[in-house]
Curated annotation (Swiss-Prot):
UniProt membrane topology term: Single-pass membrane protein
Domain TR mART core: 380-607
Cellular component, GO annotation: membrane
Keyword field contains Transmembrane helix: yes
Keyword annotations from UniProtKB, A to Z: Membrane, Transmembrane, Transmembrane helix
Superkingdom to which the source organism belongs: Viruses
Protein name per UniProt: Uncharacterized protein R390
Gene3D superfamilies per record: Toxin ADP-ribosyltransferase, Chain A, domain 1
Length: 763
């Protein structure tokens, strides 16, 4: 890939000038001559970089090949899976992973601003996420492909304006995201202190627009501009633009590619983002199948029923009133195959392939997938936790017991069901991260002492209820051995090693991951009437499996009618609970009073009794799993994350649990309005980041092994289990490094790249 940035354009010309040059690409010599970029009319005006830094322009535009001779590495550069970075391609793949969430959210926050001004459509791989499950799909692409309908001048103007808006998000309104970029790069040992100026100085635009030099043309594109440390590669510096820089490696990573079209039609709009329709998406993937190695895999996934998710477009047009409409004798896949072929100008070579793929997709979806999946609405399913028809009597008895216990504890539970749930959960969140003594917290929690008292009382109530025989017997009689509850939430992630910032868009969290929630979690055992008011495309529906066991202390309370909102049918899960992710899927939601569907992310988790139980259950999904959300003051100053965790009791399979020291925060604790779009998400993320910034500075590269257990074979007849020590890394010369077992080294170094680098350097 070859990149022009606007800094390369001579200010005295109205066109791109490129002298004839010679360069080597994989030992093959090419002659490159100037070609107009996609036949754009650049006579409109001088095209400058949006920061108007014309002093950086040069008269000669030089293209280099970033892949040539850069296949060596220094020790200490590893990808998210612990494998060494050995080439520029490996580096691009890592950038794609760790910046996926941030770029995705920022672009989705920016595009709605331009909905009324220019007709655009998101096409290609990003649009395919509407049709195939992006979680189980191992092809996750950071780069957006956007088709624009308009004149060449309008396209260039749009390119400039959207770049300016992206920089506004990064630089001003959402300044802390620059530090997010810096910290995640530093976590993977890609930058050092000599690079900080680029990320901390707002005058250095992180987003720039220019062109990618392809075989036959120049393609308009927006890049994220990354400055990496000088000694990243042993063979020299890499710079995929024409700029000369002898101090650092320079990467312009494409995050938005633009294409022109003269075909106008109303796009599909979901969450205020305009998308192209499926024929156009397939055609674009076919057009670039030779230059994008993952396009074939994306198309294969579109034909694999195991990757399918409910199609909201078909849903709202044909299946909303009666699911049988989807199988009417007059309805066939050919209807969709032929209807939208006019969305693009087909070539003779790909029209047949597009039609074949469409026929296979719609045929499989309509006559195989939808027969085994309830694709009407996630809320059409029935939740029923009870195993008796005489539930009213037992519910009333349980509620009376809960009321009596609560009245002896200053009615803290009832206050929680009112507006006090916000300060109570905020207290729990800040207790987890060790910030209760921060003066800013006292400003956020007005009645701090009452809130502390309520939290203590609530913790006591769970224990008291578990000791009341009448209560536990009623629970045992009323509830099934296992049942489901639901909760609509949005959680923000800080310091996640995979670059995650929000649970609704992130695609890299593994099945079997352990989630620690420091706050109380309100759930419902029915889909109550007003649940739609809490929904938006940026929310997640958590489906939580609860296993009843009255022989253990219960970490959930049936609140039911003893609540401010009695129709919620509430079950309140205790603060400090552990969950294990069992599945992630996307299911349709129908907007109230609107005939519009969209898919919402549904995360199914199992509520565990304690850390031991969570580790045991996580072992069913693999041998190496991550723990999210567990951070406290002990972790910040060094030492074990929890002294009680050192003693893991009971039989546990071979498994490594790594504490990522990721903070999970409920943003609605800091807001008076609900979260409805990605702009709301970024506003919340930044406001919370400002509060957590000192804490994140201390823990951003800290990691702990919570539990490690292996089986050692001393001889063929005897096996002996050995608990390895818990590893915590208070500094770069941690003694715990010498105790590492080779079995876990790859996973360990994934989070220890900075330390390994310093040791290498010191030698």
């Amino acid at each position: 890939m070859y990149v022009y940035t606007m800094e390369n354009v001579p200010p005295s010309t109205n066109y791109l000038y490129n002298p004839k040059i010679v360069y080597n690409d994989h030992d093959i010599e090419f002659n490159v001559n100037y070609m107009p970029p996609l036949e754009l009319d650049l006579g409109m005006a001088e095209i400058n970089d949006i920061d108007n830094s014309i002093n950086n322009f040069t008269n000669d535009t030089i293209i280099i090949n970033p892949h040539t001779n850069f296949n060596s590495r220094i020790d200490g550069i590893y990808n998210i899976n612990g494998k060494p970075i050995q080439s520029i391609t490996d580096l691009y793949n890592l950038i794609n992973t760790i910046f996926y969430d941030l770029i995705d959210v920022i672009i989705k926050s920016t595009l709605p601003i331009f909905n009324e001004h220019i007709l655009y459509r998101v096409i290609g791989s990003k649009s395919l996420e509407l049709y195939t499950n992006p979680v189980i799909n191992n092809v996750k692409i950071l780069t957006y492909d956007i088709e624009i309908v308009g004149t060449n001048n309008e396209i260039v103007l749009f390119l400039e304006k959207i770049t300016m808006q992206l920089n506004a998000y990064i630089n001003y309104k959402y300044g802390p995201n620059r530090y997010f970029i810096r910290n995640i790069l530093r976590k993977y040992n890609l930058i050092d202190e000599t690079c900080n100026w680029h990320y901390e100085n707002e005058s250095n635009n992180m987003f720039k627009f220019g062109f990618i030099k392809t075989t036959n043309s120049y393609q308009p594109c927006i890049f994220i501009h990354l400055i990496l440390k000088k000694n990243l590669f042993t063979t020299g510096l890499v710079n995929n633009s024409n700029q000369t820089n002898n101090n650092h490696n320079v990467i312009y990573y494409p995050c938005v590619k633009f294409y022109s079209s003269k075909i106008k039609y109303k796009p599909i709009t979901i969450a205020n983002i305009n998308y192209g329709r499926l024929p156009l998406i397939i055609n674009k993937l076919l057009d670039e199948i030779n230059t994008r190695y993952y396009n074939k895999e994306l198309l294969d996934n579109l034909l694999n029923v195991n990757y399918f998710i409910c199609n909201p477009i078909i849903q709202q047009q044909y299946c909303s009133e009666n699911i049988k409409n989807c199988f009417d004798k007059n309805f066939s896949s050919a209807y969709y195959t032929d209807k939208y072929l006019s969305d693009f100008i087909p070539t003779k070579t790909n029209i047949k392939i597009v039609k074949d793929i469409l026929n296979q997709y719609y045929g499989t979806y309509l006559f195989e997938f939808i027969k085994t999946h309830n694709c009407r609405s996630v809320f059409d399913s029935v939740l029923n936790p009870f195993n008796t028809n005489d539930k009213k009597q037992f519910i009333n008895k349980i509620v009376d017991i809960v009321r009596n216990v609560d009245e002896n504890n200053d009615r803290s539970l009832y206050r929680y069901t009112q507006e006090d749930h916000i300060p109570i959960n905020l207290y729990c969140q800040m207790r987890n991260v060790g910030l209760l003594n921060d003066p800013k917290i006292l400003d956020l929690i007005e009645n701090f002492h009452q809130t502390k008292n309520d939290v203590d009382n609530l913790d006591n109530i769970y224990g008291i209820l578990s000791g009341i025989t009448e209560y536990t017997n009623s629970i045992d009689h009323l509830f099934k051995d296992e049942f489901d509850v639901v909760s609509v939430q949005t959680f923000l992630y800080f310091n996640a090693p995979n670059g995650q910032i929000i649970d609704s868009s992130n695609l890299t969290m593994d099945i079997g991951s352990i989630i620690y929630m420091p706050n109380f979690l309100s759930t419902s055992y029915v889909f109550f009437k007003d649940i739609h008011k809490f929904l938006s495309p940026v929310k997640v529906l958590y489906k939580i499996k609860i296993k009843k066991d009255i022989m253990r202390p219960l970490n959930w309370i049936l609140v039911d009618k003893y609540s401010q909102l009695s129709n919620e049918k509430e079950i309140l899960i205790k603060s400090g609970s552990f969950f294990v992710i069992e599945s992630i899927e996307y299911l349709p939601v129908e907007k109230i009073n609107e005939s519009e569907y969209y898919n919402i992310k549904v995360i199914t988790m199992r509520l565990c009794y304690d850390m031991d139980d969570a580790i045991s259950h996580a072992s069913n999904f693999g041998t190496e799993k991550l723990l999210y959300g567990y951070v406290n003051s002990n972790n910040i100053i060094g030492g074990s994350s929890n002294s009680q965790i050192k003693k893991i009791s009971g039989p546990i399979k071979n498994i490594t649990i790594i504490n990522t020291n990721t903070l999970i925060i409920d943003p609605e604790l800091f807001r008076t309005t609900s979260l409805n779009n990605y702009n709301d998400i970024l506003n919340s993320y930044v406001s919370i980041y400002a509060l957590l910034c000192p804490l994140l500075t201390n823990i951003y590269n800290k990691i702990s092994f919570i539990h490690k257990k292996i089986t050692l074979n001393y001889n063929s007849q005897k096996n002996s289990e050995k608990n390895l020590p818990i590893f915590d890394i208070p500094n770069i010369y941690s003694d715990s490094e010498s105790h590492l077992d080779n079995l876990f080294y790859n996973k360990y170094r994934k989070y220890k790249t900075k330390y390994i680098y310093h040791k290498y350097k010191s030698n």
